[in-house]
């Protein structure tokens, strides 16, 4: 399976909400946007755009961060500051947990 699928399986174990929506991961050039990734929500469709030229570790951390946002979408958490605080506070711990499982 792909790295993205492995990350999704890992995160689904912690965030069962992720299995209740459609998630599409789209590699794209986000250089001009100055971000590694973002999540767009449309009903129960969640599109994660992720920069197409990241190191493996940055890809893992970014996808984990964005999947936390998908979980927040399902939970109805809309406050941007709360959303980012939660995602940033968890991304490195979860990245290390994921890397230790591989």
Describe the residue ranges of each PLM region.
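Catalytic zinc-binding patch centered on the HExxH motif and its immediate surroundings
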Residues: 17, 24-47, 56
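Hydrophobic (often cysteine-bearing) scaffold residues that line and stabilize catalytic clefts
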Residues: 3, 60, 64, 83
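Short pre-active-site segment immediately N-terminal to the catalytic Zn-binding motif
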Residues: 44-63, 77-79
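Zn2+-dependent metallopeptidase catalytic core
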Residues: 1-20
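Catalytic glutamate of the conserved HExxH
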Residues: 62, 66-70, 74
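Short, solvent-exposed loop/turn segments at secondary-structure junctions
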Residues: 28-31, 54-55, 68, 94-95
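Post-HExxH zinc-binding segment in Zn-dependent metallohydrolases
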Residues: 79-102
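Hydrophobic beta-strand residues in large extracellular and virion-surface proteins
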Residues: 11, 21-25, 48-50, 63
